[in-house]
Swiss-Prot record:
Residues holding substrate: R65, S66, G67, N78, T82, I83, D84
Gene designation per UniProt: dut
Top-level taxonomy: Bacteria, Pseudomonadati, Chlorobiota, Chlorobiia, Chlorobiales
Region (Disordered): 132-153
Organism: Chlorobium limicola (strain DSM 245 / NBRC 103803 / 6330)
Name the UniProt record assigns to this protein: Deoxyuridine 5'-triphosphate nucleotidohydrolase
GO terms for MF: dUTP diphosphatase activity; magnesium ion binding
Length: 153
């Protein structure tokens, strides 16, 4: 387990917590003075009230919460959102309402999850061509939609 420095930039902030013993992501709560109404097909930048100092070689990703997505069509349009190790500002979450009804976000509502992971930096080696594979340039649905067996009609 790594240690990550965290600072409350708002004394009312709820710090991120793991909801269960084996959760990969920590719940991130809204830190608001008053509720924010998220109208259908609109976005809002929601403060968390905290800032973090990640060690070099790590990132944090903000991801949607499955319950908000399933029940209210609330998500993060830039998911996963990346927090770099050298960022020192308040963690804020962009929420989008894909639903048909307004959605109210209140102080303390768990609005996202945060996963901290190692990242590798790369040094690109420019070449004239790439090696051949069976897949080649296939992408964007080229394998079809059937999970196990080809469909029979």
């Amino acid at each position: 387990m790594i240690k990550v420095k965290i600072v409350r930039v708002n004394k009312k902030a709820h710090l991120p917590v793991y909801a269960t013993a084996h959760a990969a992501g920590m719940d991130v709560a809204a830190c608001l003075d008053e509720p924010v109404m998220l109208e259908p097909f609109s976005t809002a930048l929601i403060p968390s009230g905290f800032a973090i100092e990640l060690p070099e070689g790590y990132e944090a990703q903000l991801r949607p919460r499955s319950g908000l997505a399933l029940k209210h069509l609330i998500s993060l349009p830039n998911s996963p959102a990346t927090i770099d190790a050298d960022y020192r500002g308040e963690v804020r979450v962009i929420l989008v309402n894909f639903g048909k009804e307004p959605f109210s976000v209140a102080h303390g509502d768990r609005i996202a999850q945060m996963v901290v992971s190692r990242v590798e930096r790369v040094d690109f080696d420019e070449a004239e061509e790439l090696s051949m594979t069976q897949r080649g340039e296939g992408g964007f649905g080229h394998t079809g939609i059937s999970a196990v067996h080809p469909r029979t009609h």
